[in-house]
């Protein structure tokens, strides 16, 4: 990649170093960076980030790319190395970390860039900082972790694939977005003799159903079954031809949101946020874990056996409580199976207390907060001077909601709890950038 020639700075002001930190998963390096002295320089444009080794076999180093340059982007815009197109963010991820990079070490040198335009750029090398990053393997201390990319609108996806996406590229695009998440199914099924599971939606024909069909052991699945269901029943009918498959329908619940598989012989559990659907594995942000723990596997197996009988909601909630902590690798883990009895809050109040007891920071990622106590605890974290950084699926503007009663002359009603939460979130997102929508 081309490299800008660093100009000799004429400033006599002493420039302090960049502060930078890396956050990793098996397929991601996220860099958080700041240049405190940048506020003293009106011509501070952003950062150049040099990775070593680079992006191609034998490449010594290379700059991370950025599609946002000095000219307005269009559909033909090409990504440029960040020494020529400085990164104007304080968070940036290396989208070129792939599953095979697990266990490798990379150096990231973050350098402030000053100037007035594309032909006037100065890399302030005296202020640069190098971060040494060891990318973890998928399996670590008896816990395996997969995150998908789910970034269809990102610069990285645009670099990899055409728009609109040709049909011939769909499989490759799905694999790129899944980012290795699909490998979790082969990992839990491989070598297993008996699998017990509960599944909310089962529609993925790319990886999940073929893996089930190729499985030679006993397969018992509890699935959501409602009138005219098209999210599970077709798949269950397809699996019904397998000699060792047992399907148990679940109908007496509002949402059977379980998605887990248990290797009962080896004592392993696959679970996480991902539905077993094409969207859940690729375009929706999700994760999967495999816990190597006979103790945890026993609890999940008992849960699956309870659900097999299609119990009512009160019967399912009976006795709901946190398990005793169990040691998995270097971690302490406990589990709570919802729902709880009506008006009980044992599960979520435990989370609220953990937030309140945080000493320095709280980082969270969730679909949508609907509990006011939880939201208040999160807001208080920031108000009390601790670090708060959160990501939500979306943050809507409540003023743009349709069917506002006051518009038709009717007396306004007290807003619902959900509306009050949306108003608070929207106002907070306008006030600061500590809680963001996924599309930010």
Labelled PLM ranges:
Residues 185, 198-202:
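N-terminal carbohydrate-binding/catalytic regions of secreted carbohydrate-active enzymes
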Residues 2-178, 182, 186, 190-193, ...:
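PLD/PLD-like phosphodiesterase catalytic module centered on the HKD motif
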Residues 321-323:
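Alpha-helical transmembrane segments and their helix-helix packing motifs
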Residues 342-345:
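Alpha-helical scaffold elements lining the catalytic groove of polysaccharide deacetylases
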């Amino acid at each position: 990649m081309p490299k800008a020639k660093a100009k000799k700075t004429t400033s006599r002001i002493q420039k302090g170093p960049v502060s930078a930190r890396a956050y990793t998963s098996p397929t991601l390096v996220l860099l958080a960076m700041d240049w405190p002295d940048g506020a003293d320089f009106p011509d501070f444009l952003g950062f150049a980030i040099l990775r070593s080794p680079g992006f191609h076999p034998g490449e010594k180093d290379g700059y991370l790319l950025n599609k946002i340059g000095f000219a307005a982007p269009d559909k033909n815009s090409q990504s440029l190395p960040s020494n020529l197109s400085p990164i104007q963010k304080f968070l940036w991820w290396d989208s070129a970390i792939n599953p095979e990079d697990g266990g490798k070490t990379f150096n990231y040198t973050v350098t402030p860039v000053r100037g007035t335009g594309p032909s006037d750029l100065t890399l302030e090398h005296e202020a640069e900082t190098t971060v040494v990053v060891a990318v973890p393997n998928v399996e670590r201390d008896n816990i395996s972790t997969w995150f998908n990319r789910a970034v269809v609108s990102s610069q990285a996806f645009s670099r990899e694939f055409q728009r609109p996406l040709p049909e011939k590229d769909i499989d490759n695009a799905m694999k790129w977005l899944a980012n290795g998440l699909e490998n979790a199914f082969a990992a839990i099924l491989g070598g297993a003799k008996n699998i017990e599971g509960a599944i909310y939606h089962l529609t993925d024909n790319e990886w999940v159903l073929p893996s089930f069909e190729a499985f030679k052991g006993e397969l018992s699945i509890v699935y959501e079954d409602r009138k005219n269901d098209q999210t599970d029943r077709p798949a269950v009918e397809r699996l019904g031809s397998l000699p060792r498959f047992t399907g148990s329908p679940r109908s007496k619940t509002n949402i059977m949101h379980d998605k887990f598989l248990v290797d009962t012989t080896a004592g392993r559990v696959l679970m996480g946020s991902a539905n077993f659907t094409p969207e859940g594995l690729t375009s929706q942000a999700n994760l999967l874990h495999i816990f190597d723990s006979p103790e945890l596997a026993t609890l999940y197996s008992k849960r699956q056996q309870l659900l097999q009988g299609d119990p009512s909601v009160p019967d399912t909630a009976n006795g709901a409580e946190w398990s005793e902590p169990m040691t998995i690798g270097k971690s302490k883990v406990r589990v709570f199976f919802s729902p709880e009895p009506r008006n009980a809050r044992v599960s979520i109040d435990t989370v609220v207390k953990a937030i309140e007891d945080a000493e320095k920071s709280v980082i969270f990622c969730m679909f949508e907060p609907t509990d006011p106590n939880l939201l208040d605890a999160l807001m208080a974290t920031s108000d009390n001077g601790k670090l708060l950084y959160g990501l939500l699926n979306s943050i809507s503007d409540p003023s743009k909601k349709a069917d506002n009663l006051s518009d038709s002359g009717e007396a306004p009603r007290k807003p619902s709890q959900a509306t009050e939460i949306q108003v608070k979130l929207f106002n907070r997102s306008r006030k600061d950038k500590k809680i963001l929508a996924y599309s930010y």
